[in-house]
């Protein structure tokens, strides 16, 4: 789950769409309204689905996926992955922007993050086994995709 999904959850719970719309949710809200015409329960179903999403996902012993960042203490390699996951806060995983080029390597995991566009908006930035995949498409950069099976990169 990312910060824009959190905007939707806040909107649904508080019936206040200002923050979401201010941060680019207009077309998504319009599409939700259109879907509600076909299925009156669509918004509730979407809420239930998004509420079930995690802010951090661990795939086997290979990958850690999170929207913005993962908190890793200086001695992170002394902890197992479950302890690392327990240290996380959703605010940090959804909003942090202070890790680029300051990240720590955690065991042999490849950490995949987005949220903060990389400076060179034409390719994925890799640093210390962390892959920054936000290539700034919203600002005219590339839309990047990283296929985890073979780490092949695709750009549009």
Residue ranges and their predicted role:
Residues 15-18, 82-83, 128-131, 149:
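Glycine-rich, phosphate-binding/catalytic loops in enzymes
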Residues 4-5, 69-71, 117, 136-138:
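Catalytic metal-binding/acid-base residues of hydrolase active sites
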């Amino acid at each position: 789950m990312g910060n824009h999904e959190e905007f939707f959850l806040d909107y649904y719970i508080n019936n206040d769409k200002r923050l979401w719309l201010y941060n680019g949710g207009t077309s998504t809200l319009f599409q939700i309204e259109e879907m509600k015409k076909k299925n009156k329960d669509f918004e509730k179903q979407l809420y239930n689905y998004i509420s079930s999403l995690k802010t951090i996902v661990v795939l086997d012993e290979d990958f850690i996926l999170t929207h913005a960042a993962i908190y890793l203490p200086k001695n992170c390699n002394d902890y197992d992955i479950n302890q690392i996951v327990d240290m996380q806060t959703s605010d940090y995983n959804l909003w942090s922007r202070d890790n680029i080029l300051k990240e720590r390597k955690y065991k042999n995991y490849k950490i995949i993050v987005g949220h903060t566009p990389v400076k060179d908006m034409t390719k994925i930035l890799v640093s210390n086994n962390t892959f920054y995949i936000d290539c700034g498409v919203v600002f005219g950069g590339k839309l990047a995709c990283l296929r985890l099976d073979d780490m092949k990169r695709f750009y549009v």
